Every structure is written in structure tokens, then in C-alpha cells.
Amino acid sequence: MNIEGFKVNFLGDSITEGVGVTDRKNARYDNRIKNLFNLSAVNNYGIGGTRLAHQTHASEKPRHDLCFCGRVYNMDTTADMVVVYGGVNDYLHGDAPFGKIGDKTPATFCGGIYFLMNYLKENYKDKPIIFMTPARCHYGTIDCFFTSNHKNKIADAKPLIAYVEAIEETGKLFGIPTLNLYDKLGLDPHDPETKERYTVDGLHFNDAGHEFIANALKGFIESL
């Protein structure tokens, strides 16, 4: 797919916001994509700590409750393409139930994905939409191979791979291509050398990590 000259919306969390990079204008993955494809503009809608689904109880940091499903209405509908990259905060500290594929309410994680994809398909008709899943993380005492140990998590919480698979499966329902960064990014912060070289803390990527993400997204776009 050729997207030269496109204006692209990027909806995401702290990684899309640029936490971890030294120069957001040049090092952040969305701006790298802008340069790689000679885009006309990128609109960055990244807010750290935010989740796809609604939070059941108010967070200690109100900013974290600005969920994707609420913010999607504020995006520029004249954009030529939309990229959504999120889900890791739902895994890390979201208290919404996981739910099941086919849920339509943003009160569950699975329902939040459905809600977002449905809204985007209706409001960006015939425009490319791409979702990116969370990559692997090893953040403090939280290991993506296991359920998050954050105090907010409820009984039906799952390891990160379940959140990844829910995004992929819902993408298939809507015909929305999904880039699986969990499997295909090729970076695993469980390896100490990889963690130091590409992340600042096992979750947020540094400049080199954002270059990795941009190249993965570039290849994915070109394959469509």
C-alpha cells in the first residue's frame, strides 16, 4: 500500500506519546513513519497510562482514565488513515472485565476493541485502519507471560497474550489488519541485553526501540 502524502492519525498510550525517546519530533515512531513515507502530516493522540476500555473505578491519576473509546471522537476525521496502538495498560492496571470476543460495550476489554473498530469503520469509510498489538514487556515486577499483579486487576485478568489475541480476533471480524508486535517485533525484554538496548524500563521503548517499531510498521503497511 502506498501512503505517500497521507495525513495519518495515531491513537495510543505512552509509547505513542513518546515516553522513553530523547526527541519526540524525530525519534518517535509516528514521526519516523512520516519521514519514511513522506506523509503530509501525522496527528498524535497518544496519552500515557490510557487504556482501550473504560475503567470501572476512578484511577489515582485521572489522566489514565481518558480511554481510547472516549478519545476517538476527538480525532481528525479528515485524516487519510488511522493507526491504533494500545492494550498494554488494560493488561497492566485496567480494572475492566476482560469480557469475550463479540462484546460491544467499552465496559469490557473485548467490548472496547469492538467499539473502537466499529466506530473507526463507520467514520473513516474506505480509509485504511491498522491496529498494533502490545509488544512483550517485563516491567518492574510485572511479567507479560503471567497475569499482572497490579492491585486493580480482577479475577478474570489474563496474561498479555490474551489481550493480543483479542485484538487480532476482533480485527478479523471487521477486516482490520493487525500488526502483532508481541510475536513479530522481535524484541523480548526478558533478555537483559535487549531490555537495555531497546527500552528504558522493559515497557517503554527508547530511540532504538522506536526505530524498530517504525520499521515493523513500515513493512506491514507495504505488505497490504
List the predicted regions and their residue ranges.
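Conserved SGNH/GDSL esterase-like catalytic core that processes O-acyl groups on lipids
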Residues: 2, 7-9, 15-107, 111
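Short hydrophobic segments within beta-strands
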Residues: 11-12, 132
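Conserved G/P- and acidic residue-centered "switch" motifs that form tight phosphate/ATP-binding loops
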Residues: 12-13, 206
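Alpha-helical cap/lid subdomain in secreted, periplasmic
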Residues: 66-224
